[in-house]
Amino acid sequence: VGLLSRRRPTPPAGAVPAGGPEMDFPRPAGAGARQSRMPWRLPDEPAISGIAADAVTVGALTVRAASLVGPGHRCAEPAQHRQDAYRLGRDPGRRFLLAAVADGMSDSSRSHLGANVAATALVARLRADLGRGADPDGPALFLDAARQMSGMAAQQKVTENDVRAAALAAAVPVEPAPDGTRPVWLSWLADVSAWLRTGAGWTRLTGTDKEGLDQDVLTEFLPFHPGRTRTARVSVPPGAVLALATDGIGDVLAGGAAPWFAERWAGPPHIASFVADVGYDARGRLDDRTAVVIWCDR
């Protein structure tokens, strides 16, 4: 009787679609994409997970991170691997939150591996440099990641062209300066971006808005161009909300959905809600999407 009492009632016939239950993601721009309502498929080869997520507190920082395979990749048969990646960490002295976000290029057959190696290498090198008291060096950081990506390509018996990725690394002070601000160190290559929540929208801290017919064509990426890495130190105000994102999120923060995300991420949401936000459904937005959002003093 005890076992029977814990059984869920059998749903009526026809209650669940033949292809499985639909997964409804929020639609910040109204119309959704047809692919978002299609079943998720598997790649032919064993794959990294289609969804990765973390919810952590590091000192006075609250962090939500999520990476999802995009509708255009997950509904194909066979599906494509999630080509985005992120990593979180902290320095040995626990003074900095370290984060890296990487976006594998769709026309590189092993870019999912390249993105994961890049994100891991960037955080590891940042941690090592800060641990020995050195200032972060963007070009050296990205050169180290490029070498590891090249080594992985050789191990996989593929070319460096098969593992290309864009990337961004950040070091965020756990505690604020006496005036409440935080000097955030950022280093990036290509269109992975950093954003600061400002009122009902977002201000871009790294990268440039996409324009023209070739707006999605990258001319710089790892492992080929670590010397083109750009670096900035940005002072963020008390209570700031900082977002690090691949273009699957960055493109909508630059567009009409920016107020929706600003409202949703005014404070740290439950991780399940955050994953749903990152997995948003919008017509024409089919790419993988990744966001690491940091709330200061929350």
Where in the sequence are the language-model features?
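Catalytic core of PPM/PP2C metal-dependent serine/threonine phosphatase domains
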Residues: 133-198, 229-235
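Extended, polar/charged low-complexity intrinsically disordered and coiled-coil segments in eukaryotic
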Residues: 205-207
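Helix-loop-helix
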Residues: 120-154, 260-281
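Residue-level marker for buried hydrophobic side chains located in beta-strands
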Residues: 100, 188, 242-244
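N-terminal entry segment of metal-dependent catalytic domains or homologous docking segments
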Residues: 11-124, 192
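Short helix/loop capping segments that flank catalytic or ligand/cofactor-binding pockets
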Residues: 108-110, 196-197, 252-254
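A short catalytic or substrate-binding loop motif that flags glycine-/basic-rich loops and adjacent residues
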Residues: 77-82, 159-165, 283-286
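C-terminal catalytic subdomain
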Residues: 1-40, 44, 152, 162, ...
